[in-house]
């Protein structure tokens, strides 16, 4: 049975941060929530009970049951709905008697909320001052408010990812294998794959910049002969490198998954490569990649 009484939820974030959007919670907190709620037991409310409290319908819950991380997918789907917030999530966990979750994750949730507020304040402070007449003539980038399948159309709760995948259409089969190995296993990583996650109809350059810089913690580059001919991949790679000069933040991870006739790109030679073609290290490939993407 869930531990604690009425005061057990005292470790939860204070009311000043509870109205924040669910996007304030980072991947570490979401994974720990999954560890608590993915387990189906008879003595504690699990993710299905939470989904019902969030007003998900029966068929929607059945669809979530097919996912490797149903709690994570539930949070992703819920954060785009009206009324979804950190405070509401805590209220539902309290209602379900999951005081153990509140006690264990309360400090981490509070930390995430404070970081989110600080980042919002910094972004607001860095905005250039403009004359009202001039500002009114500048087109607003509303297109970036709803660019992925689980985005909030108003831009209040943008979808976030562990990694952006830079690839050519001809390499899509390897990208699909990457999805199976990293998303549908115990790693439970969340990848941004353009053909799957990005909505059609907007500028590819603007979308790539937004996702790489603001939505994804890292970028995986699937290097192949076709990659070398892609202007889109070239732009994405150079943009990611510009955000982390010298690769000090380990932001970009190159992958070589098949033999190449052309020379490996010189711009990536100074970064450690994940080599899927080496039979001696192939058994360690997915573990190394998953750990690299899981770093804070």
UniProtKB/Swiss-Prot annotation:
Keywords: Antiviral defense, Cytoplasm, Disease variant, Immunity, Inflammatory response, Innate immunity, Nucleus, Phosphoprotein, Ubl conjugation. Its main location: cytoplasm. It comes from Homo sapiens (Human). Changing residue 206 to C: Found in hematological malignancies; uncertain significance; somatic mutation. GO terms for biological process: 3'-UTR-mediated mRNA stabilization; apoptotic process; cell surface receptor signaling pathway; cellular response to lipopolysaccharide; cellular response to mechanical stimulus; cellular response to oxidised low-density lipoprotein particle stimulus; defense response to bacterium; defense response to Gram-positive bacterium. GO terms for molecular function: ATP-dependent histone chaperone activity; death receptor binding; identical protein binding; interleukin-1 receptor binding; molecular adaptor activity; signaling adaptor activity; TIR domain binding; Toll binding. InterPro entries: DEATH-like_dom_sf, Death_dom, MyD88_Death, Myelin_different_resp_MyD88, TIR_dom, Toll_tir_struct_dom_sf. Changing residue 179 to N: In Pococurante (Poc); abolished MYD88-dependent sensing of most Toll-like receptor (TLR) ligands. Changing residue 136 to G: Found in hematological malignancies; uncertain significance; somatic mutation. Adapter protein involved in the Toll-like receptor and IL-1 receptor signaling pathway in the innate immune response. Acts via IRAK1, IRAK2, IRF7 and TRAF6, leading to NF-kappa-B activation, cytokine secretion and the inflammatory response. Increases IL-8 transcription. Involved in IL-18-mediated signaling pathway. Activates IRF1 resulting in its rapid migration into the nucleus to mediate an efficient induction of IFN-beta, NOS2/INOS, and IL12A genes. The intermediate domain (ID) is required for the phosphorylation and activation of IRAK. It holds the Pfam family Death. PROSITE patterns: DEATH_DOMAIN (PS50017), TIR (PS50104). The modification Phosphoserine is found at residue 244. Changing residue 98 to C: Found in hematological malignancies; uncertain significance; somatic mutation; loss of NF-kappa-B complex activation; loss of interaction with IRAK4; reduces homooligomerization. Homodimer. Also forms heterodimers with TIRAP. Binds to TLR2, TLR5, IRAK1, IRAK2 and IRAK4 via their respective TIR domains. Interacts with IL18R1. Interacts with BMX, IL1RL1, IKBKE and IRF7. Interacts with LRRFIP1 and LRRFIP2; this interaction positively regulates Toll-like receptor (TLR) signaling in response to agonist. Interacts with FLII. LRRFIP1 and LRRFIP2 compete with FLII for MYD88-binding. Interacts with IRF1. Upon IL1B treatment, forms a complex with PELI1, IRAK1, IRAK4 and TRAF6; this complex recruits MAP3K7/TAK1, TAB1 and TAB2 to mediate NF-kappa-B activation. Ubiquitous. Signal peptide: none annotated. SMART domains: DEATH, TIR. This is Myeloid differentiation primary response protein MyD88. Changing residue 207 to T: Found in hematological malignancies; uncertain significance; somatic mutation. Ubiquitinated; undergoes 'Lys-63'-linked polyubiquitination. OTUD4 specifically hydrolyzes 'Lys-63'-linked polyubiquitinated MYD88. Deubiquitinated by USP3 that cleaves 'Lys-63'-linked ubiquitin chains leading to inhibition of MYD88-induced NF-kappa-B signaling. Changing residue 282 to A: Slightly reduced activity. Residues 159-293 form the TIR domain. Changing residue 39 to M: Found in hematological malignancies; uncertain significance; somatic mutation. The lineage of its organism: Eukaryota, Metazoa, Chordata, Craniata, Vertebrata. Changing residue 34 to Y: Rare variant; uncertain significance; loss of NF-kappa-B complex activation; loss of interaction with IRAK4; reduces homooligomerization.
